[in-house]
Design a protein with these regions (language model features):
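Tandem repeat scaffolds
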Residues: 1-246
Length: 246
């Protein structure tokens, strides 16, 4: 039996750790791999700079935890059978990195995510509500998030500023960015079919090489200076009810 006060010991167990609560544990710069947690709760734990590989966190919740500059590789945060995801509430994800992970149906709520990176991962149905910029004194430092080569179909991004973020080579079909600020965001090479940009601002956004059948420009708040590829012109004209002849 693992004492609930010993998270480091729990990571060393060969059998799954089920239904335990870990609070106020400090695993700064901790390195671990191949552990499995199910229905566990992590409160006020520190994982800053940790490197976590090939671990599973099934139906887990992280509340008020810090993951600054932590790295996750090939980790799973969703139940493969029920598709129930894990929850992240009021966590510090600043400069954290997730590579080749499964974050499908996860809920990221009221977190900080300045320069968060998610690459080569699945995050279908992700619910994302996080501050992606950093305020220093009275000055706002723009950072955004970086999501590249990710499956994000049906993801919902809460109305917020994602300015200067990069959503590149991602599957963004059926995603929602309603009422969000996407100024200077890069959507290069992503699939945008049925994406919801209602009320969103896409000023100087880059949609080059992105794929879409139609784009509801009228529903956007603004798209001044938006960049598209030449091969997208026909679809954009069709979206406005304009047909090309000759």
């Amino acid at each position: 039996m693992v004492e609930k006060s010993s998270l480091e010991a729990a990571f060393s167990m060969k059998e799954p750790v089920i239904g335990l609560r870990f609070a106020s544990e400090d695993l700064t710069d901790f390195i671990t791999s191949e552990s499995k947690f199910a229905d566990c709760r992590f409160n006020d734990c520190v994982f800053d700079g940790a490197k976590i590989r090939e671990c599973e966190f099934i139906g887990c919740s992280f509340s008020n935890c810090s993951f600054k500059e932590a790295e996750f590789f090939n980790c799973i945060f969703v139940d493969r059978e029920t598709q129930a995801g894990s929850a992240w509430n009021y966590c510090d994800l600043n400069e954290a990195k997730f590579k080749a992970c499964n974050l499908s149906n996860n809920r990221i709520v009221k977190c900080e995510a300045f320069l968060l990176e998610i690459t080569d991962s699945s995050a279908v149905g992700l619910q994302f509500d996080a501050e992606v910029h950093r305020k220093i004194s009275k000055r706002m430092m723009f950072g955004g998030v970086v999501l590249q080569r990710c499956k994000l179909q049906y993801a919902v991004f809460a109305a917020s500023s994602y300015e200067e973020s990069r959503f590149e080579s991602c599957d963004l079909r059926d995603c929602s960015f309603v009422d969000s600020n996407l100024s200077r965001v890069s959507l290069m090479g992503s699939s945008l079919n049925n994406i919801d940009f209602t009320g969103a601002t896409l000023d100087f956004a880059n949609l080059s090489q992105a794929t879409f059948d139609e784009m509801d420009l009228a529903a956007m708040a603004s798209f001044k200076g938006m960049t598209v590829s030449r091969d997208q012109h026909e679809n954009l004209l069709r979206s406005m009810g304009i047909l090309t002849s000759g």
